[in-house]
Design a protein with these regions (language model features):
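Hydrophobic alpha-helical bundle architecture
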Residues: 361, 421-499, 515-522
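Bacterial N-terminal signal peptides that target proteins for export
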Residues: 1-10
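Short linear motifs in exposed loops
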Residues: 230, 387, 487-489
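Active-site bordering "gate/hinge" segments
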Residues: 20-365, 370-374, 379-382, 395, ...
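C-terminal, non-catalytic macromolecule-binding modules
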Residues: 384-438
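Bacterial N-terminal signal peptides
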Residues: 9-19
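Residue-level structural signal for beta-strand termini and adjacent loop
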Residues: 252-255, 389-391, 490-491
Length: 576
């Protein structure tokens, strides 16, 4: 089963899995690379005499120090830094036409291990030698099985090679400005911000998390590629959770991303977000559960962005077009209409920010050493391209810089910054009026406005329904007769892609950004999705699964008296 999830910093574990670095000054960027290149050359010469001989060998390394500060209810629960160096050895035996990574044997192409923290050439080379030997044995055995399977199984429909030929790039990276973080000051700041949840006794679980620094990724290949890519990033997450009387867990999360800690929102702005989360959760606890519904719906820009990431984006990933276990929804629809003609979809990892918001899916080179490219996937509703790694598919023979992975896993075609634009727009202030017109036109008592979204997932394999599920958190019934909007809870957007994507009839004129972490076969990678608010003629929702545990019987100890704030719509919101 292919299961792809898109989350916005919901769990500490997710954030720790994203590469960051800080602390002591990193070693010169060429020192580790030179050791990798020397051992790569030695291994290539030696293994070239083996049978079967490798035709490709690469060493990748990631050097990072992670600084993480977590505060809960006014007190620190973690403030730590940890240095880590990991190496991945990727090796292919056979030929580019057929090698050990073919089909289900793809994991045989990689072996991983930890590198010494010190820049000791001998110790580093020894680890690479061990990993290379282990990987060669794994790859050679897998290639034998691949050849056996080819002889006894029916011919595959897509006869593309297993590996594309790409120009080897040399890029030793620019100089990253030293990462500056006053850890003591941020510890105090997170204490104060997290203490804001004490005013909300119904928020049973909360945290404020800061993580950031600089990282260096290294790649050396037998083709001659040599890449050192530095990066700097900071993330701050505010999370609160409560439970309704019927056992339904309710979560609200706000995530902020910047190039430096100084670019994060001010303390007063972050305190306001805590109050917003606390107020929202209080309102959600008393909101009625939603009923199954099919009818008009309005999605905010953030909600529409996640919708497109799940429903369209994963089905544009190149490897899904040749894997015969996949549903291949769009494989044979190139140059056909797949979206309304007013919509265009690009994936552009070269963009660092949009409208002043840093995009999480930015990178200069993908994890196979191919320069990132802007890919126009859908032009005026017509499918034009897929997101390609170095795994070719029919009529798409080369990578377009979208081979991505989490350390320890083989790369596949993945999304970076997925951006949806529209030529059929109205002012956001007018979109609500058009929404109500559509509700009346269909003689529905109400429509649903999806204000904010938590994440989602999609199923892409043939063995399961070609379906998706998007998980909203702030959903409103908008009544056609003018009654006040009503907050509801426990609703998920569900459906199938081909039908749902063509129910869009109008969009707003302001794009919104959703930054998150996406999980698929090649692991968790940071991504962004961008879209305007969208009006759908029809969307289907279902009731969300809930637990059976009641809220805590014992009141929380010693919390401040909670205020009774009144929920108001966000200024500039399109739905209310």
């Amino acid at each position: 089963m292919t299961h792809s999830a898109f989350r916005s910093g919901l769990l500490l574990a997710l954030l720790i899995g994203v590469p960051f670095a800080v602390g002591s000054s990193p070693p010169p960027p060429d020192a580790l690379l030179k050791t990798m290149q020397r051992e790569l050359e030695r291994a290539t010469r030696s293994l070239g005499k083996s049978d079967p001989a490798p035709y490709f060998l690469s060493y990748a390394a990631e050097d990072r120090d992670a600084v993480t500060i977590v505060a809960v209810n006014g007190s620190l629960v973690a403030s730590e830094s940890a240095r880590r160096r990991q190496a991945d050895v990727m090796l292919r035996v056979g030929t580019p036409g057929l090698d050990n990574t073919h089909g289900a044997s793809r994991p045989s192409g990689i072996t991983s291990g930890m590198l010494p923290l010190e820049n000791n050439p001998d110790a580093t080379a020894h680890v690479l030698w061990q990993l290379t030997n282990r990987e060669y044995e794994q790859a050679a055995g897998a290639f034998l099985r691949v050849k056996t399977n080819e002889a006894v199984r029916s011919q595959e429909e897509d006869q593309s090679p297993d590996f594309s030929q790409e120009a080897a790039k040399i890029e030793l990276g620019g100089t990253v400005l030293p990462f500056s973080l006053d850890q003591k000051a941020w510890e105090d700041r997170l204490r104060r911000i997290s203490a804001g949840f004490l005013k909300y006794p119904d928020v049973y679980t909360s945290l404020v998390l800061l993580q950031g620094g600089t990282a260096r990724s290294y790649l050396a290949t037998s083709e001659g590629a040599a890449i050192v890519e530095p990066s700097t990033i900071v993330r701050l997450v505010i999370e609160g959770e409560t439970r309704a009387d019927d056992g339904m867990d309710l979560l609200r999360v706000e995530t902020f991303q910047a190039a430096s800690a100084s670019q994060l929102p001010s303390e007063s702005e972050l305190m306001a977000k805590v109050d917003k989360i606390g107020t929202d959760l209080k309102a959600l606890r008393s909101a009625p559960p939603a009923d199954p519904y099919i009818g008009p719906a309005l999605l905010s820009g953030r909600a529409a962005a996640v919708f497109f990431h799940e429903v369209l984006g994963h089905r544009l990933e190149g490897h899904r077009q040749r894997d015969e276990r996949e549903g291949q929804t769009f494989t044979k629809k190139v140059n056909q209409q797949v979206l309304p003609s007013f919509l265009t979809v690009v994936d552009d990892p070269t963009l660092q920010e949009l409208s002043g918001v840093k995009l999480a899916g930015h990178y200069d080179f993908d994890d196979e050493g191919v320069p990132a490219e802007r890919v126009e996937a859908v032009e005026n509703g017509v499918l034009k391209n897929f997101l390609m790694s170095r795994m070719p598919i029919t009529n798409f023979n080369h990578s377009n810089g979208h081979g991505r992975r989490q350390a320890g896993l083989m790369p596949t075609g993945r999304q970076g910054n997925l951006i949806v634009t529209s030529t059929n727009t109205v002012k956001d202030s007018e979109l609500r009026a058009r929404f109500i017109e559509e509700i009346k036109k269909q003689a529905k008592p109400y429509g649903l406005y999806f204000e904010d979204i938590q994440g989602g997932f999609t199923l892409t394999t043939r063995a399961l329904p070609q379906a998706f599920q998007v998980i909203p958190v702030m959903v409103w019934r908008v009544y056609a007769d003018g009654r006040p909007d009503e907050l509801v809870r426990g609703v998920d957007i569900v459906g199938t892609p081909l039908l749902s994507l063509n129910n869009i009839i109008l969009t707003g004129d302001t794009e919104q950004v959703f930054n998150g972490v996406c999980g698929a076969e090649s692991g968790q990678v940071p991504v962004a999705a961008v879209a305007p608010a969208m009006l759908f003629s029809e969307i289907e929702v279902q009731k969300r699964a809930k637990g059976t545990q009641r809220p805590p019987l014992l009141p929380p100890p010693g919390l401040k008296t909670a205020p009774s704030p009144t929920h108001t719509a966000d200024p500039g919101g399109v739905g209310r």
